[in-house]
């Protein structure tokens, strides 16, 4: 039991890194299955380029859109946005843009992994480039005149020595592009991580405390919400069967839910660990949590919206 608890604690502590690792492994495995089982280059001048690019880029686009759909911050941003007042929408426009940029960066991980693994494999690239008329003259340079006509057949005709040479050249180009893409992604991730941490308004240990607080808030909110929902449902059912008036059961209003569902902004003057924390700490019960002077979106605190959305989604 202690070992199981230790593994669970490790998973909670490093769930972000484990999640990214799992996404990368699943994407790489999916690409391998896709390229060996589904992909069959048509080996015709009219279809090779289109077929290869479709297999290379369309799954990447699908993974990118799936990354948006699976992001808690996406639905936090979109839910109810069309029913808000014009003044509220305009005031949160910049914050929404910054959040969209952060969500896009995270959602791009899986598609970039797909493209990189596909380029390392080389099959999609070989098929696409062999059907490109612009690259035909370059690939057939210093070769006989029939090379350009035979080029679309390269992915299918692997027996001829000349075809094998061109195929090896295309695979080498594809793998070089794949490693360049991997290096560029790692470099950009490292730069973004370093810059966001450099401009963090709080210290390293406070960030760790912040994560612990959000985890506990999530657990307690889900527990209290389940208990309150059970109590409300039980009272309504009792009232229905007994034909009596239900007892008053205080439940947060629609405005209250909207307040704690807003995007989190950091303010150095009044520091709160979540929108729920900010809501219960407001000076006046009737006051709103709209953006005030000094509120900013901090990239390193993006996990606050994810955790809070998990709370309300769990509700």
From Swiss-Prot:
This protein's UniProt keywords: Cell membrane, Disulfide bond, Ion channel, Ion transport, Membrane, Transmembrane, Transmembrane helix, Transport
Transmembrane segments: 22-37, 47-68, 104-128, 170-192
Any one GO biological process: ATP export
Catalytic activity: ATP(in) = ATP(out)
Cytoplasmic side: 1-21, 69-103, 193-315
rRNA-binding as UniProt keyword: no
GO cellular component: immunological synapse; plasma membrane
InterPro entries the record matches: CALHM
Extracellular topological segments: 38-46, 129-169
Disulfide bridges in this chain: 41-127, 43-156, 140-147
Alphabetical list of Pfam families matching this protein: Ca_hom_mod
Compartments reported by the entry: Cell membrane
Main location: membrane
Membrane topology summary: Multi-pass membrane protein
Record GO terms (molecular function): monoatomic cation channel activity; voltage-gated channel activity
PANTHER family recorded: CALCIUM HOMEOSTASIS MODULATOR PROTEIN, CALCIUM HOMEOSTASIS MODULATOR PROTEIN 6
Similarity remark: Belongs to the CALHM family.
Subunit (UniProt): Oligomerizes to form decameric and undecameric channels.
Function statement: Pore-forming subunit of an ATP-permeable channel. In response to pathogen-derived and proinflammatory stimuli, relocates from intracellular compartments to NK-dendritic cell and NK-macrophage immune synapses where it mediates ATP efflux and NK cell activation involved in antimicrobial and antitumor responses. May assemble to form gap junction channel-like structures with gating and ion conductance likely regulated by membrane lipids and voltage rather than by extracellular calcium levels.
Protein name: Calcium homeostasis modulator protein 6
Organism of derivation: Rattus norvegicus
Gene designation per UniProt: Calhm6
């Amino acid at each position: 039991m202690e070992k199981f608890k230790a593994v669970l604690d490790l998973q909670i502590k490093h769930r972000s890194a484990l999640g990214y690792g799992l996404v990368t492994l699943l994407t790489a495995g999916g690409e391998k299955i896709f390229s060996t089982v589904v992909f069959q280059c048509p080996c015709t001048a009219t279809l090779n380029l289109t077929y290869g690019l479709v297999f290379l880029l369309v799954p990447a686009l699908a993974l990118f859109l799936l990354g948006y759909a699976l992001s808690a911050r996406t639905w936090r941003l979109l839910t109810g946005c069309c029913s808000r007042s014009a003044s509220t929408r305009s005031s949160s426009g910049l914050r929404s843009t910054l959040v969209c940029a952060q969500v896009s960066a995270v959602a791009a991980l899986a598609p970039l992994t797909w493209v990189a693994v596909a380029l390392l494999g080389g099959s999609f690239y070989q098929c696409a480039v062999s059907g490109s008329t612009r690259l035909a003259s370059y690939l057939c340079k210093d070769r006989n005149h029939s090379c350009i006509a035979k080029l679309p057949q390269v992915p299918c005709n692997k027996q001829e020595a000349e075809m094998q040479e061109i195929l090896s050249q295309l695979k080498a180009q594809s793998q070089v592009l794949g490693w360049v893409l991997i290096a560029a992604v790692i470099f950009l991730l490292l730069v973004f991580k370093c810059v966001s941490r450099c401009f963090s308004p709080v210290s390293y240990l406070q960030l760790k405390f912040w994560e612990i607080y959000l985890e506990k808030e999530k657990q307690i909110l889900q527990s209290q919400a389940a208990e309150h929902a059970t109590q409300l449902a039980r009272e309504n059912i009792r009232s229905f069967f007994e034909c009596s008036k239900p007892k008053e059961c205080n439940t947060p209003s629609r405005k209250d839910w909207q307040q704690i569902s807003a995007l989190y902004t950091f303010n150095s003057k009044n520091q709160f660990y979540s929108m729920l924390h900010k809501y219960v700490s407001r000076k006046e019960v009737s006051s709103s949590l709209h953006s005030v002077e000094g509120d900013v979106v901090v990239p390193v605190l993006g996990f606050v919206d994810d955790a809070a959305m998990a709370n309300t989604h769990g509700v």
